[in-house]
Amino acid sequence: MKKYKMVINIDMLRLFLPLLGGSVSGSLFGRFLGSEGSAIMITTCVSFCALVVFIFGLFYFRKKGPLKRILYLFLVGFVLSLIRIKVVYLLGGQALPLLDPILMYAVGAGALLGPNGAESSATWEEDSFELDVLGESFSSSKTDMDSQVAEAPQTEEGEPSVNQVPQEAGASHRVGPYQDQGLATDRNGNPIDLNDSLPPSSLLYGEIESSASVRARDLELEKDIKRVQRLTRNFDNAEDPARRLEVAARLDPEVRELDQKWALFQEKDASGLGR
């Protein structure tokens, strides 16, 4: 008989723990989720799952007694909570103060007491102290912003600040008549002739020709250096004395010619820099 009672107690715990967890999680999801729609959906789903578990548990415990009374009491409270959720969802937040007294009266509890012992009403009342504090903070922040704009600090070069209007900014920031037409102007507002700032065409052509000649000279020097290097390798690799003399006879004029070209190009570069 004792073993049978122990089995009943374990089965009762298996029944009530999911119901308790479902009710607590539903209330938490309904209170603390950021999205109201997701909170309502999750709370409804959890409540429906808890109701299904409760129905299966009710059919499981077919005996009469205090356990079945507790299950009936839980069913009534659960249905009332589900109705409250649906009514709040349909009517909005205004249905909360209307349903709370009805539920309190049905349960048998009195009105909640505040910190000073007085009964607290279900409706929200404005707190004058909180409104005054919010008003003072808003006014102080607004005055700070106005003072920062009115100071209009100068830059390091003494130019007026960007926050100033064009009339107060000075002569350097006044819009000239040519700026409205999209023309380039100087600091005084006078138009600038872009053709005067461009170099003459002869100078440009001279620079192009000089750059082309320098490029051709570099290519010529590179070819001569490669030819001298090839002859030097042939001279080092030649084992026959006659072959070495032949390569040396060709290498000496190439080296002298390369030295003359290098000296001539250096002289031209020096004369060009002197100009």
UniProtKB/Swiss-Prot annotation:
Residues 140-191 are annotated as: Disordered. The chain crosses the membrane at residues 15-35, 39-59, 70-90. Its main location: mitochondrion. The keyword Cell membrane does not apply. It is a multi-pass membrane protein. GO terms for cellular component: mitochondrial membrane. Keywords: Membrane, Mitochondrion, Transmembrane, Transmembrane helix. It is found in: Mitochondrion membrane. This is Uncharacterized mitochondrial protein AtMg00670. It comes from Arabidopsis thaliana (Mouse-ear cress). The lineage of its organism: Eukaryota, Viridiplantae, Streptophyta, Embryophyta, Tracheophyta.
